[in-house]
């Protein structure tokens, strides 16, 4: 034991000395350090943490005492390090590695060319040897669309991860940047894929169509980026299309998305004559040459016809930067012209601060402008050390703690996506702090369950590359970890948890059952998998009809899962008519005085509750409960039962059996019985009181309104106007040279089968997208119809 105490002393002194910057220290010096009042706490901290136990001493018996002490000192020093100290102690090699890492996503409105852009990125970085297009026209399909359904429909359904190395020339020297990339869906029905990608990414490329500019899903993606403070660069794609207008896109980013933006490029040529771009920072021409535009021809000679435009747009760029960056503002006021290096530095600062987005241009399908966009990813988007990632320290009342992407610090990671694989559950993980090694043990902060990591892989769409270790700031996937999406993992030494991603409510449901009873097990297995992988896909069994009900973000969302059941599990299903997820609420105050009194031989049920229900006085959709009971007429132990009863009553409203929102219950008085009162009685009394008072409180059905955006050739404007007048309220109309866009708030109930009507009205040339907007009172005739239908269903079940 004397040896252990001596080594403990050495360890504590060494740890104290390390914190003071001493690199080499003797045993005597360590003892002296521990004895000094200012450093004595290191020894006590060592004792309290019990980092150096007899068992660890025996495990390290082949090491000298000094070596053990040095090892333990490093561990203690690392665990105690502040974020600032960790950053200061980062080795040059580690700092250089992080500076060359980019975790980015590609996000946009549907059909803006995200997957095509990603395919070019993979080709130019050497990750794929040949380019394949979406929809599988060449029999192969884009690399990132690995699902058969994605290739058939030409849409991205699941986000796909990959990684690539981009060689960028900096001051004549070639630097290699490591890019972790996630390609996300553009359809609103798969918005959770974008949501969880944005939760773990450091930056993003927002792709816009040069013809359509900012579209409905662009606005949704912008909102998601802002929710997680994700800096972005913007890429105006499809510059080779007829009617391409990049300046309209730049203007709409400023006005519709409310984020300062300026072009850093000007296109050379237009539409089919697109040749390349002019870099406004260095004032040079960049043209793609050779097969698939692999070679770049760089020239200082700007075509005469666009020279004046380039000078004008460069000045606009500097003026816009002066609005968002202090250094450029100072130079602008002093009428100084910033150098290209100063402009680049300002763009980087403002972009990382989410104050600005630089706009680049090109056409992925025409192999133009993608390489300069990759350079911009490296120049302007943050590395993992540039972003403020925080965890919540549960031991300190969930106080925010900054995480530092330093390999020597204790591990902290977030599981952000789950995927079923032939080899088991694949868990996608973002490593925020520390490093992860194959065979390591981690702790799930939800339940503190210990898990072993048997296999670590880097993903390349549906392909995997095994690795033994992954560093801080990286994205990887692991096998053999039983967890839920959004779980936090640590090495056990930190009581940290990471905030999860936002999950929107489902807006549509339908009943489903397998056609063959023999498929019940496969059906159940598939449903469990889908719910685990997708938080927006939900399932419940209706208590009255005993039907299995699935809920999701829209018709396409549920249709895809029904199709996946058939293809992946060979389960043919019968589905009912889609159902709208209505809500119920109250519009006025109504008092209640309800007495529950039942006797059945033994102890009975007795509970009296008095009070009122009213719309939530604070507004919003939350339900609120309050007790104003005085004099102990209802003991405190029964008040919580009343609250629980109110909450249970709100799960299934009296009008349609849908959720109740925006209501408040206040209990002011009541009565109890010596033997017959119980939690159960007061729970039931609160439920019954709420139900009885609901009608008097002006119970109302709320229906979901969808923000619907329709785009079509201008010649069909009249036809679409007639369609939309029957379904909702037109909010905005924008007419372009060849096409127009209409935005309307439509009742979801009126939108079933709309795609068929739109095809007929536009000869198949129109397209539309929907996203949930808000709940609004249903028209009186619809409410009456829905309530009568619900009452008939209840009556039919009672008579069975």
UniProtKB/Swiss-Prot annotation:
Single GO biological process annotation from the record = mitochondrial translational elongation
Q: Name one GO molecular function term.
A: translation elongation factor activity
Task: List the pathway annotation.
Answer: Protein biosynthesis; polypeptide chain elongation
The UniProt keyword set, sorted, is: Elongation factor, GTP-binding, Mitochondrion, Nucleotide-binding, Protein biosynthesis, Transit peptide
Protein name according to UniProt: Elongation factor G, mitochondrial
Task: Tell me where in this chain the tr-type G domain is found.
Answer: 99-385
Q: In the database record, which residues form the transit peptide?
A: 1-59
Can you tell me which family this protein belongs to? Belongs to the TRAFAC class translation factor GTPase superfamily. Classic translation factor GTPase family. EF-G/EF-2 subfamily.
Give a GO cellular-component term: mitochondrion
Q: Which PROSITE patterns match?
A: G_TR_1, G_TR_2
- Gene designation per UniProt: mef1
- What are the binding positions for GTP in this chain? 108-115, 183-187, 237-240
**Which species is this UniProt entry from?**
Neurospora crassa (strain ATCC 24698 / 74-OR23-1A / CBS 708.71 / DSM 1257 / FGSC 987)
Which is a Pfam family this sequence falls into? GTP_EFTU
CDD domains documented for this protein: EF-G, EFG_III, EFG_mtEFG1_IV, mtEFG1_C, mtEFG1_II_like
């Amino acid at each position: 034991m004397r040896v252990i105490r001596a080594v403990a002393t050495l360890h504590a002194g060494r740890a104290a000395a390390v914190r003071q910057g001493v690199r080499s220290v003797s045993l005597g010096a360590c003892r002296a350090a521990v004895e000094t009042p200012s450093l004595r706490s290191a020894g006590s901290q060592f004792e309290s943490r019990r980092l150096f136990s007899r068992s660890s001493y025996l495990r390290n018996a082949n090491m000298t005492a000094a070596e053990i002490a040095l090892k333990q000192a490093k561990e203690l020093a690392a665990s105690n390090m502040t974020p600032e100290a960790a950053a200061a102690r980062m080795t040059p090699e580690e700092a250089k590695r992080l500076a060359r890492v980019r975790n980015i996503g590609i996000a946009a409105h549907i059909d803006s060319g995200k997957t095509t852009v990603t395919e070019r990125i993979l080709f130019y970085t050497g990750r794929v040897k040949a380019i394949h297009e979406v929809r599988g026209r060449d029999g192969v399909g884009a690399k990132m669309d690995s699902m058969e359904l994605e290739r058939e429909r030409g849409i991205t359904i699941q986000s796909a991860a990959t990684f690539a190395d981009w060689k960028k020339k900096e001051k004549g020297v070639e630097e290699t940047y490591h890019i972790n990339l996630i390609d996300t869906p553009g359809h609103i029905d798969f918005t959770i894929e974008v949501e969880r990608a944005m939760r773990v990414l450091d930056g993003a490329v927002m792709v816009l169509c040069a013809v359509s500019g900012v579209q409905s899903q662009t606005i949704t993606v912008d909102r998601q980026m802002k929710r997680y403070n994700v800096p972005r660069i913007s890429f105006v794609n499809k510059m080779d299309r007829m009617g391409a207008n990049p300046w309209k896109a730049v203007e709409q980013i400023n006005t519709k998305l409310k984020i300062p933006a300026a072009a850093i490029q000007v296109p050379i040529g237009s539409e089919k004559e697109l040749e390349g771009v002019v870099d406004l920072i260095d004032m040079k021409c960049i043209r793609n040459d050779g097969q698939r535009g692999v070679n770049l021809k760089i020239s200082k000679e700007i075509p005469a016809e666009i020279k004046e435009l380039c000078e004008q747009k460069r000045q606009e760029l500097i003026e816009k930067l002066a609005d968002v960056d202090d250094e450029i503002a100072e130079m602008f006021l002093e009428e100084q012209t910033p150098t290209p290096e100063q402009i680049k530095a300002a763009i980087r600062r403002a972009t990382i601060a989410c104050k600005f987005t630089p706009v680049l241009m090109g056409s992925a399908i025409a192999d133009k402008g993608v390489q300069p966009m990759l350079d911009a990813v490296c120049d302007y988007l943050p590395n993992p050390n540039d972003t403020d990632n925080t965890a919540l320290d549960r031991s300190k009342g969930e106080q925010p703690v900054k995480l530092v992407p330093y390999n020597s610090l204790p591990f902290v990671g977030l599981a952000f996506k789950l995927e079923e694989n032939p080899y088991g559950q694949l868990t996608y993980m973002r490593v925020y702090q520390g490093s992860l090694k194959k065979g390591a043990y981690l702790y799930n902060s939800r339940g503190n369950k210990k898990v072993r990591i048997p296999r670590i892989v880097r993903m390349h769409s549906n392909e995997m590359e095994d690795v033994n270790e992954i560093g801080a700031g990286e994205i990887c996937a692991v096998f053999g970890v039983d967890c839920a999406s959004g779980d936090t993992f640590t090495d056990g030494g930190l009581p940290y948890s990471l905030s999860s991603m936002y999950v929107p409510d489902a807006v549509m449901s339908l009943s489903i059952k397998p056609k063959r009873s023999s498929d019940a097990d496969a059906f159940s297995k598939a449903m469990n998998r889908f719910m685990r992988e997708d938080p927006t896909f939900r399932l419940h069994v209706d208590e009255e009809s005993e039907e299995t009900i699935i809920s999701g973000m829209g018709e396409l969302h549920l249709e895809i899962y029904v199709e996946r059941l058939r293809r992946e599990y060979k389960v043919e299903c019968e589905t009912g008519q889609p159902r709208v997820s209505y809500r119920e609420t109250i519009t006025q105050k109504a008092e209640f005085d309800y007495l529950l009194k039942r006797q059945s031989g033994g102890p009975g049920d007795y509970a009296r509750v008095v009070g009122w229900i009213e719309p939530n006085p604070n507004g919003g959709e939350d339900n609120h409960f309050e007790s104003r009971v005085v004099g102990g007429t209802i003991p405190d132990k029964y008040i919580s039962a009343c609250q629980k009863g109110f909450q249970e009553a709100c799960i299934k409203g009296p009008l349609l059996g849908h959720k109740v929102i925006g209501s408040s219950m206040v209990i002011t008085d009541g009565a109890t019985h010596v033997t017959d009162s119980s939690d159960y009685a007061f729970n039931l009394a609160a439920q019954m009181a709420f139900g009885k008072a609901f009608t008097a409180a002006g119970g109302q059905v709320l229906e979901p309104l969808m923000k619907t955006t329709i785009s079509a050739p201008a010649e069909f404007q009249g036809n679409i106007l007639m369609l939309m007048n029957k379904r909702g309220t037109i909010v905005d109309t924008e007419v372009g040279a060849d096409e127009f866009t209409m935005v309307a708030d439509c009742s979801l109930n009126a939108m079933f089968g709309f795609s068929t009507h739109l095809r007929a009205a536009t000869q198949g040339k129109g397209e539309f997208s929907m996203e949930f907007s808000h709940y609004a009172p249903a028209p009186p005739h619809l409410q009456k119809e829905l309530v009568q239908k619900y009452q008939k269903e209840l009556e039919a079940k009672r008579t069975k």
